[in-house]
Protein backbone atom coordinates (compact mmCIF):
# COMPACT_ATOMS: atom_id res chain seq x y z
CA UNK A 1 0.00 0.00 0.00
CA UNK A 2 1.11 3.49 -0.80
CA UNK A 3 0.22 6.31 1.61
CA UNK A 4 -1.66 9.31 0.25
CA UNK A 5 -1.28 12.83 1.55
CA UNK A 6 -3.93 14.99 3.11
CA UNK A 7 -4.24 18.69 3.65
CA UNK A 8 -5.31 21.76 1.67
CA UNK A 9 -3.79 20.44 -1.57
CA UNK A 10 -5.05 16.93 -0.89
CA UNK A 11 -7.07 16.34 -4.07
CA UNK A 12 -4.24 16.96 -6.53
CA UNK A 13 -1.69 15.50 -4.14
CA UNK A 14 -3.78 12.35 -3.79
CA UNK A 15 -4.15 12.07 -7.56
CA UNK A 16 -0.37 12.40 -7.94
CA UNK A 17 0.05 9.88 -5.14
CA UNK A 18 -2.20 7.38 -6.93
CA UNK A 19 -0.14 7.61 -10.10
CA UNK A 20 3.14 7.52 -8.18
CA UNK A 21 1.95 4.41 -6.34
CA UNK A 22 0.79 2.84 -9.59
CA UNK A 23 4.18 3.39 -11.20
CA UNK A 24 6.93 2.64 -8.69
CA UNK A 25 9.27 1.97 -11.61
CA UNK A 26 8.38 5.20 -13.43
CA UNK A 27 12.04 5.96 -14.17
CA UNK A 28 12.39 2.72 -16.13
CA UNK A 29 9.24 3.58 -18.08
CA UNK A 30 10.52 7.11 -18.81
CA UNK A 31 13.76 5.62 -20.13
CA UNK A 32 11.80 3.26 -22.38
CA UNK A 33 9.51 6.02 -23.64
CA UNK A 34 12.31 8.43 -24.45
CA UNK A 35 14.43 5.75 -26.13
CA UNK A 36 11.82 4.61 -28.68
CA UNK A 37 13.37 5.00 -32.13
CA UNK A 38 11.52 5.60 -35.41
CA UNK A 39 10.02 2.29 -36.48
CA UNK A 40 10.51 0.91 -32.93
CA UNK A 41 12.54 -2.04 -34.23
CA UNK A 42 13.42 -3.20 -30.70
CA UNK A 43 9.75 -3.06 -29.59
CA UNK A 44 10.26 -0.66 -26.66
CA UNK A 45 6.79 0.83 -26.99
CA UNK A 46 5.23 -2.61 -26.48
CA UNK A 47 7.49 -3.25 -23.46
CA UNK A 48 6.42 0.08 -21.94
CA UNK A 49 2.73 -0.70 -22.62
CA UNK A 50 3.17 -4.13 -21.04
CA UNK A 51 4.41 -2.35 -17.88
CA UNK A 52 1.93 0.54 -18.04
CA UNK A 53 -1.53 -1.05 -18.12
CA UNK A 54 -1.05 -3.60 -15.30
CA UNK A 55 0.35 -0.86 -13.07
CA UNK A 56 -2.43 1.58 -13.91
CA UNK A 57 -5.25 -0.88 -13.26
CA UNK A 58 -4.20 -4.17 -11.62
CA UNK A 59 -1.24 -6.46 -12.04
CA UNK A 60 -3.59 -9.10 -13.44
CA UNK A 61 -4.84 -6.70 -16.14
CA UNK A 62 -4.27 -7.83 -19.72
CA UNK A 63 -5.07 -5.32 -22.46
CA UNK A 64 -6.15 -8.03 -24.93
CA UNK A 65 -8.81 -9.53 -22.61
CA UNK A 66 -12.10 -8.57 -24.30
CA UNK A 67 -14.15 -9.88 -21.37
CA UNK A 68 -12.59 -7.29 -19.02
CA UNK A 69 -14.86 -4.27 -18.32
CA UNK A 70 -11.88 -1.91 -18.16
CA UNK A 71 -10.88 -2.93 -21.69
CA UNK A 72 -14.43 -2.12 -22.79
CA UNK A 73 -14.11 1.34 -21.25
CA UNK A 74 -10.71 1.88 -22.90
CA UNK A 75 -11.94 0.65 -26.29
CA UNK A 76 -15.01 2.90 -26.16
CA UNK A 77 -12.96 5.93 -25.10
CA UNK A 78 -10.31 5.31 -27.76
CA UNK A 79 -13.01 4.92 -30.44
CA UNK A 80 -14.47 8.30 -29.46
CA UNK A 81 -11.08 9.99 -29.73
CA UNK A 82 -10.31 8.22 -33.02
CA UNK A 83 -13.69 9.34 -34.40
CA UNK A 84 -12.96 12.94 -33.44
CA UNK A 85 -9.51 12.75 -35.05
CA UNK A 86 -11.02 11.19 -38.21
CA UNK A 87 -13.62 13.95 -38.34
CA UNK A 88 -10.88 16.60 -38.14
CA UNK A 89 -8.82 14.84 -40.84
CA UNK A 90 -11.84 14.90 -43.17
CA UNK A 91 -12.61 18.49 -42.18
CA UNK A 92 -9.11 19.52 -43.32
CA UNK A 93 -9.72 17.74 -46.64
CA UNK A 94 -7.53 14.68 -46.17
CA UNK A 95 -8.31 10.97 -46.46
CA UNK A 96 -8.32 8.84 -43.34
CA UNK A 97 -7.39 5.63 -45.17
CA UNK A 98 -3.73 6.44 -45.83
CA UNK A 99 -1.70 6.25 -42.64
CA UNK A 100 1.88 6.89 -41.67
CA UNK A 101 2.55 3.86 -39.47
CA UNK A 102 -0.87 2.21 -39.62
CA UNK A 103 -1.34 0.84 -43.13
CA UNK A 104 -3.89 -1.97 -43.09
CA UNK A 105 -5.99 -2.27 -46.24
CA UNK A 106 -8.88 -3.33 -44.00
CA UNK A 107 -8.71 -0.19 -41.83
CA UNK A 108 -10.43 2.87 -43.32
CA UNK A 109 -9.04 5.01 -40.47
CA UNK A 110 -5.27 4.35 -40.64
CA UNK A 111 -4.32 8.04 -40.43
CA UNK A 112 -6.75 8.64 -37.56
CA UNK A 113 -5.14 5.71 -35.71
CA UNK A 114 -1.73 7.35 -36.22
CA UNK A 115 -2.75 10.84 -35.12
CA UNK A 116 -4.83 9.77 -32.11
CA UNK A 117 -1.85 8.24 -30.28
CA UNK A 118 -0.93 11.34 -28.20
CA UNK A 119 -4.49 11.52 -26.86
CA UNK A 120 -4.69 8.00 -25.42
CA UNK A 121 -3.45 9.15 -21.97
CA UNK A 122 -6.54 11.36 -21.59
CA UNK A 123 -8.75 8.30 -22.09
CA UNK A 124 -6.52 6.24 -19.79
CA UNK A 125 -6.86 8.82 -17.01
CA UNK A 126 -10.65 9.00 -17.39
CA UNK A 127 -10.97 5.20 -17.42
CA UNK A 128 -8.77 5.09 -14.32
CA UNK A 129 -11.41 7.27 -12.61
CA UNK A 130 -14.23 5.04 -13.93
CA UNK A 131 -12.45 1.70 -13.48
CA UNK A 132 -15.03 0.34 -11.02
CA UNK A 133 -17.91 1.13 -13.42
CA UNK A 134 -19.51 -0.99 -16.11
CA UNK A 135 -19.96 0.28 -19.65
CA UNK A 136 -23.54 1.57 -19.53
CA UNK A 137 -25.17 4.68 -21.03
CA UNK A 138 -24.21 6.86 -18.05
CA UNK A 139 -20.54 5.85 -18.28
CA UNK A 140 -20.60 6.23 -22.07
CA UNK A 141 -21.85 9.81 -21.58
CA UNK A 142 -18.98 10.42 -19.12
CA UNK A 143 -16.52 9.30 -21.77
CA UNK A 144 -18.25 11.43 -24.43
CA UNK A 145 -17.99 14.46 -22.11
CA UNK A 146 -14.24 13.86 -21.98
CA UNK A 147 -14.01 15.35 -25.48
CA UNK A 148 -15.45 18.65 -24.22
CA UNK A 149 -13.45 18.65 -21.00
CA UNK A 150 -11.32 21.73 -20.41
CA UNK A 151 -7.65 20.91 -20.00
CA UNK A 152 -6.17 23.74 -17.90
CA UNK A 153 -2.59 22.68 -18.69
CA UNK A 154 -3.31 23.31 -22.39
CA UNK A 155 -5.81 26.15 -22.00
CA UNK A 156 -8.44 24.48 -24.16
CA UNK A 157 -10.76 21.48 -24.49
CA UNK A 158 -9.66 18.05 -25.68
CA UNK A 159 -11.65 18.50 -28.92
CA UNK A 160 -9.93 21.81 -29.63
CA UNK A 161 -6.53 20.31 -28.76
CA UNK A 162 -7.20 17.51 -31.26
CA UNK A 163 -8.11 20.14 -33.86
CA UNK A 164 -4.87 22.07 -33.25
CA UNK A 165 -2.75 18.92 -33.31
CA UNK A 166 -4.28 17.57 -36.54
CA UNK A 167 -3.89 20.99 -38.21
CA UNK A 168 -0.25 21.25 -37.08
CA UNK A 169 0.45 17.66 -38.19
CA UNK A 170 -0.80 18.49 -41.70
CA UNK A 171 1.29 21.66 -41.77
CA UNK A 172 4.32 19.56 -40.88
CA UNK A 173 3.51 16.85 -43.43
CA UNK A 174 3.10 19.59 -46.06
CA UNK A 175 6.65 20.80 -45.53
CA UNK A 176 6.50 23.06 -42.47
CA UNK A 177 9.66 22.40 -40.45
CA UNK A 178 7.96 22.62 -37.06
CA UNK A 179 6.90 19.24 -35.70
CA UNK A 180 3.66 19.40 -33.64
CA UNK A 181 4.14 18.88 -29.90
CA UNK A 182 1.84 18.47 -26.94
CA UNK A 183 4.49 18.29 -24.24
CA UNK A 184 3.57 14.90 -22.74
CA UNK A 185 7.13 13.59 -22.41
CA UNK A 186 8.23 16.55 -20.28
CA UNK A 187 5.31 15.96 -17.93
CA UNK A 188 5.74 12.18 -17.51
Locations of the language-model features?
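Active-site helix-to-loop segments that bind/position phosphate- or nucleotide-bearing substrates
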Residues: 1-188
Amino acid sequence: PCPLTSGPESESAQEFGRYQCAFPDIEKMKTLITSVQPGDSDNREAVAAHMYFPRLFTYEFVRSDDSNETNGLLNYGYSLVMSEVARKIAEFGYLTEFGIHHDSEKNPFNLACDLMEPFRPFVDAKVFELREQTLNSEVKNELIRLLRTDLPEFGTSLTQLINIFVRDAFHYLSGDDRLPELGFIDEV
